[in-house]
Amino acid sequence: MIYLDNSSTTKPYDEVLNVYEQTSSRYFGNPSSLHRYGAETEQLLQAAKNQIKRSLGLKKYDIVFTSGATEANNAALKGAALSKIKTGKHIIATSIEHPSVTESLEQLKELFGFDITYLSVNEDGFVSIEDLKAAIRPDTVLVSMMHVNNEVGSVQPIEAAGEVLKEHSNILFHVDYVQGIYKVPLAIEKAGIDLCSISGHKFHGLKGTGALIVKEGTRLIPLITGGSQQKGIRAGTEHTAGAVSLAKAINLASADFDTRLDTMTAVKELFMNRLSEIEGVVINTPQMNSAPHIINFSVPGIKAEVLLHMLEEQDIFVSTTSACSAKEHKPSKVLLEMGKGEQIAGSSIRISLNYSQTSDVAEPFMNALRPGIKKLREMMR
């Protein structure tokens, strides 16, 4: 079995599973309780926060544990926008954001009258900093920009955007860091980011674990109320075992990061080179400034789902669009925004790698893909 759908989810590390089970069994107290079991659990929860902050180089930030990045994005965007509603009602985002961002913004537009400006991207999936500058208005209160696009892997100019926004202290800066964390380095504090979303199951943690990284002094209107937990940003008894497992996954992902990054980059380049040799294959991932784990390509004339299931028959698992949108059977919105056209957008396949995979995965993939494409083309004549 060759699993090449790691941008959708990754297999949890054994150590993460073990620490989750141990924490659930030994530290079952409610962190808000005043007795010893509560105090011990609260200390463990705080230790998990501190470990995450150390690993990510954060000093002036707090960690709000969430059920994942979808919740973190919702909490960040809605919480920030509603906290600023008396100041202004204009928000800027890119046109290729994850649905948890775009649908949150559209909800703010529909329910509260916010005006949303979506920055277009070029053919490689990059936004223009000049477009960002031009879009800023006196009533702009929030900018949201994903770090790494989840479909094609383009890396947005977050640091440059942060420099622009430092000149506008009234504007909050949110970054969806889900596909970038421990794939593409990002100095969160240096970039001037106010809110940053991460998800544990994208780097061998557990589903249902994630966090919103919040800069000190950033005010958010809570989406979940009913308690003072997590400084009132997210009410409800904290999922201590989930938080500890997230910290463990981050700790493991950070170990020997540079070496593993080099390996992943080499495997990606091998895939890109081999795919470019196949007649009719269009590579959608940009050659420069793209993440080391994502390769997106299209075979115009062959539907993505058909190609996906053909590979599945060979025990090779890939994906089409974002996993959150895959069952809609629509052409990739990201590729359409990049100007690729319906044929390319409707036939795109995403390969996404994990830390442990080497060049050994490329050969069996190509051995299945080449004859598979040939067979499908012959059937369509």
Curated annotation (Swiss-Prot):
What InterPro entries is this protein classified in? Aminotrans_V_dom, Cysteine_dSase, PyrdxlP-dep_Trfase, PyrdxlP-dep_Trfase_major, PyrdxlP-dep_Trfase_small
Q: Which reaction does it catalyse?
A: (sulfur carrier)-H + L-cysteine = (sulfur carrier)-SH + L-alanine
Where N6-(pyridoxal phosphate)lysine occurs, the residues are K202
Record has Metal-binding as a keyword:
yes
Active site location: C324 (cysteine persulfide intermediate)
The EC number(s) given in the record are: 2.8.1.7
> Does the record bear Iron-sulfur in its keywords?
yes
Q: Cite the entry's keywords alphabetically.
A: Iron, Iron-sulfur, Metal-binding, Pyridoxal phosphate, Transferase
Extract the Pfam families matched here.
Aminotran_5
- Cofactor(s), by name: pyridoxal 5'-phosphate
Residue positions binding [2Fe-2S] cluster: C324
Gene Ontology molecular function: any one: metal ion binding
- Record's Gene3D superfamilies? 1.10.260.50, Aspartate Aminotransferase, domain 1 (3.90.1150.10), Type I PLP-dependent aspartate aminotransferase-like (Major domain) (3.40.640.10)
Its top-level enzyme class, in one word, is transferase
The residues the record assigns to binding pyridoxal 5'-phosphate are: A69, T70, N150, Q179, S199, G200, H201, T237
Entry's family note: Belongs to the class-V pyridoxal-phosphate-dependent aminotransferase family. NifS/IscS subfamily.
The entry's function note states: Catalyzes the removal of elemental sulfur from cysteine to produce alanine.
Identification of the protein by name: Putative cysteine desulfurase IscS 2
Which species?
Bacillus subtilis (strain 168)
